[in-house]
Amino acid sequence: KSNFELTRAYFLFKIIGNSTVVKITTSITKFALKFNLPVTFLIKATVFDHFCGGVSEEDCNPVINKLFKNNVHSVLDFSTEGFNSEYEFNECLKKKISIIEFIKNKEEIPFAVFKPTCLGSTELFIKKSLGKKFSENEELMWSRVINRFEKVCKKAHENNIKILIDAEEADVQKAIDDLAILMMRKFNLLKPIVFNTVQMYRKDRLAYLNELINNKSNDKVVFGLKLVRGAYMEKERQLACERGIESPICETKNDTDNNFNLGLDFVFNNLERISFVCASHNENSVLKVMDMMKNKNISSNDSSIWFGQLYGMSDNISFNLAKRNYNVFKILPFGSVKNLMPYLIRRAEENTSVSGQTGRELQLIQNEKNRRSKLKS
């Protein structure tokens, strides 16, 4: 990073570390964008450029090339949210297909990614997850969702590109899990193409993993799994509180850490059937995976194991892994500033809620600034 980028990062994480400032800034930004006030340039020059790759695929190329020179791969994520109509779902499908076309034969971009509710309505996913009976029209709409999933995964399969299916809120996750395994049964028979995301801050995810392996219908499947802690903690807890139900999220960070570690144990006990991504900003989790690989005599660049972090976060982890020849990528969101605001707000809220994350980022940035100052003197 340049000195300017380091200073900007320090400034941003200072703001993110204050939950009150995050709430106020978020409200002001939403208001400004809603009424088309001239704030886009300011957002683009600060938080957008720090956490996002650009406004288009081509616009991301300088970042992609810069990362790859340091042995860090990229995953392009068209991160717009809030689609509601069949037209929008079909447009999103076209975009995902075009991204796969754009990245095929690009060594620096080994994965594609998509958010399930970009291909179908959230309400439909919720109803399917609850096991409620569809109307005739809803059955037709759901068949189109399945068809969109299949088209994306088939395109990835045809071009030998791995594809990550994002996890979402607990309300919709059961339907996503079912679609993910349906796609794996079609496209993961010889090698892993489709990867489902498992949020280990949920209390039920170990049971889900065991069910995957033990289900006889999956005997021929090579599983693709991306393990994360989770990105919707505040929202999940708030919804559970409003509904008067038990939260699906682990009670404490320690419980989540234990769950994540048990998930890693599960993966390494079943590596003959699993290819996986350790998508974590937690140094201890990354070190644990490295130790487990060493104990099993797995080479650092084994194609079945990847590490992933978000662009703009945990550069110390990503670049140190790359330096040691591990497979690592950065998720690189792109799109218009306005469309990416839900993603950027979630990043700010997540960093505020994750204990110690912002402090670690600030300390690492300060250490690098100090190192550069010493080199000058």
Residue ranges and their predicted role:
Residues 1-377:
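Positively charged, amphipathic and often flexible ligand-engagement surfaces
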